[in-house]
Amino acid sequence: MTAMTRKARPAGLVAIDREMARQRSDALASYRQAFESAAKVAASLKKTGRALLLGMGGSHAVNRAVEPLYRDLGIDAVALPLSEQLGQPLPLTGKTVLISSQSGESAEVVRWFSETGGTADTFGLTLEGGSFLARTATCLVGAGGTELAFAATRSLTVTFALHLAILAALGQDPAAAFAALEAPSEIDVEPALAALRKVATVVTSGRRLQGVAEALSLGLVELSRRPCFSLEGGQLRHGPMEMLGPEIGVILFRGDDATAGLVTAMASSVLEAGAPVVMFDCSSAAPVEGAVTLRFSPASGMAAIFAMLPVAQRLMIAFADERVENAGTPVRSTKITRSE
């Protein structure tokens, strides 16, 4: 009799596992240690009333996710890739600039400061206290140090916690977000994995939670090396519906907010086109028949983000592990992107 052998966990995924195992504790510690810097950022935002959120990769996805949360507090917030700001810059006068970079060493970060010199209202969010960004600007520094594994997991959660500190300093109640962070969901991702097993491409989409959708699509691409991309719900509706079919998997994010009905309508349309749908659902609405629904307690904003994010991370890792032998070990990229 030949004993069945299990596939060894790839080294890259083991490294990600280590990051994820401490992301909640690091996020909580990051929030608690950020009070002083968060108060400075909040004071600047109250003075300017405008925020320019700059970052690359996963940092930009975080910025997209928190963009509506700042707007809810009356801040005119705009999130742009830092590369776009370098090439087609928005004016900086009268704005609070928040630059996010987990390493604090990205090529775009270094060039931006070299070309602009920064401003008195420029702040950073990073995981590395000794980085270029931390040395150059007043920074909120996350706990736990630099994320070593490829594909952002802990760095996303920690950066969200740093933003939560700023939002709390602006007057937002962090209680619901804390509750979601302290009690992670153990939702089984296998039904979602099964629904996506035969797809060649994944599209992620949301409305107010579009930033989370973008973070997941980036992780899926990095780990699975399959084409995965994200379209905001309205943008998906305007033309790209033509691509839908059984080989295109669609992952939707629905929160307990005013845009939930639009996400529901999109799920129905995608199913009518014959494409499998996975729904990350923090809404109070009924599940969409035919969609695989990962159901969370009703939540919106940062509470929904903290509830959904670790489950989305587990899904992207499992999706990649089924398709790539050495998932988590990059073949064309590096953890810190030092070139443009």
PLM regions and their residue ranges:
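Phosphate-moiety recognition in structured ligand-binding domains
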Residues: 2-16, 137, 269-340
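Active-site phosphate/pyrophosphate-binding segments
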Residues: 12-49, 139-249, 259-260, 323-340
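Glycine-rich phosphate-binding loops that contact phosphosugars or nucleotide phosphates
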Residues: 46-188, 241, 249-298
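Residues within well-formed alpha-helices
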Residues: 62-66, 212, 216, 311
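Short glycine-/small-residue-rich flexible loop motifs, especially phosphate/cofactor-binding loops
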Residues: 67, 217-218, 267, 317
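Active-site-adjacent beta-strand anchor residues
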Residues: 99, 206, 305
